[in-house]
Amino acid sequence: MAATYAALTSVLGTIDKLLRSNLLVGLEEVHKQQLESLDKMFDTLQVSLIGKCDGGEPIITKGLQRRIKHVALYAEDKVESLMKQLIELDDDEQALECCRAKLDKVSQHVIQVTDFVEELIIKQKINNCPEAESSTSPRLDASIRENVMEGYNEERERMVQRLTRGSGSNRREVVSVVGMPGIGKTTFAKTILFDNSIKRVFRIRGWITVSNNYDLRKLLLVLLRDVIRMGDGNDNTMDIGKLAERVQQGLKGEKYFIVVDDIWSQKAWDRISHWFPDCGNRSRFLLTSRDREVGEYAATNPNESLVMRPLTQDESRCLFYHKVFGENYSIRGSDIDEFEKVGEKVVTNCKGLPLMITAVAGILSSKSKLDEWMEVAQSVSSLVNDDDYKQCLKVVALSYNNLPSLMKACFLHFGVFPKAHVISVKKLIRLWIAEGLINLKGVDEFEQVAARVLHDLIGKSLVIVEKRSLDGQIKTCRIHDLFHDLCMMEAESEHLLYVLRSDSTIMISQLYTNFRWISIQSENYDTFSSYIKARSLYNINDA
């Protein structure tokens, strides 16, 4: 969907520029009206694109999304060609007639697709949209989420001290832990929950996982049955209000510690926070979120929020070997030195992300040959077909799937850069604008909008700040390798991006009709002629 949304945003911006220019003087009023009609039709398509059925699935199917995208790209090419001709026009009636014919042809294509979409929406309303198939949460299973914590020793000590001794206030307080998916927030929170000091101070301790698709009734039942221990057979028949009252009664007068894991929105916190009474006895919450703004919103003191860091090389190594060989691990055999060397490469490739280290270690734990380890070490991305790696990607994909369409397109644009590439923020923002990703109608301050999008992506832990200026402004940024893999998978599946590397096997002649962005990351290319239909050609040679 992101590629289609980006194409529609871009063509709308191009039409808007033409309508506000002085280039239409030679055209008749009917052709100006055609442009305005095109503008309205593409606007309608963009609104329809983000529409959902009652079951939560998109109204516009993937096949139709591709068709809309191709029409939008075709229309933008023709409108830009029209602008070029109008600029060069010198009262040439033949050229003017050619411009009119182009507009007519584009309008016919758009009308066909728009009519089809409108018919589809009507049918969906009649049928009330089939409910989406139920699916299990893509968080990793118990084997990968095993409660093993390497590193963060100082952070744990400070957190326990903060929760048990507090700030001096007797009021109920919230401390937040924020960071990118897979960085270890949930495991960190588990170690805090089971810490002996926490057990001594808080009589009632509990855990609820909110997630992005939370069910208030289920959360209340978990609190009643597993935390407060006062659930009974009548709970299932109670409405949410009655269940909330029972939770409040059960916690009244108690000193409790509750972990609220994986919360996605301020609204979610507002909906559950009133369940917990403030009895003036220093009750505490530990809240985890991948969205920094959500964490700071809920925190009693936002400045005390813990931003999870990547593991150091030593911490990564300990976690890796623990996962590969077990708790009392040791490496034996004649190839011990070689295995350690290869293991070091694997650890380095995981860039300090615990979820990635755990997933890769889970794969290597079943491999006993040195050459198998060496194959994995060459590139972590070579594991893309492995089930554990796919599970790992599904976890981080949750953040991407919940982005607005505009932010999705901007996030996917990171894929044009090589892995671990540090990107100038100024350059990135200008590229987004040049690509038409920020061409919002009625918005003139494109750079401000782009900066806000980047800030939101950073706040949602999808983008890492690499360097700041002396006044605190972000100078450079990058994305984690795991997110880069996600970018590539999503962008290529939507025919938005193709990266031409030295090992690329696709025929050059196949590229010009299929991809919007071509990123050349190899010295071995011979011609640009075949890329003429691609909107953008990036030559990024990091050799």
Model-identified regions with their sequence ranges:
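Membrane-inserting effector segments that mediate pore formation, membrane fusion
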Residues: 1-26
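Leucine-rich repeat
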Residues: 4-7, 44, 49-52, 56-59, ...
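Non-catalytic, charged helical/coil tracts that couple and regulate nucleotide-powered enzyme cores
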Residues: 12, 18-21, 36-58, 223-237, ...
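Extended, amphipathic alpha-helical segments that serve as helical scaffolds
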Residues: 19-89, 103, 110
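Alpha-helical bundle protein-protein interaction modules that mediate dimerization/oligomerization
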Residues: 78, 85, 89-131
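Surface-exposed helical/coil interface segments that assemble multiprotein signaling complexes
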Residues: 79, 84-89, 98, 277-279, ...
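N-terminal flanking helix/linker immediately upstream of nucleotide/cofactor-binding cores
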Residues: 112, 116-183, 187-196, 200-203, ...
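Hydrophobic residues in beta-strands of the RecA-like P-loop NTPase core, especially within AAA+ ATPase
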Residues: 258-260
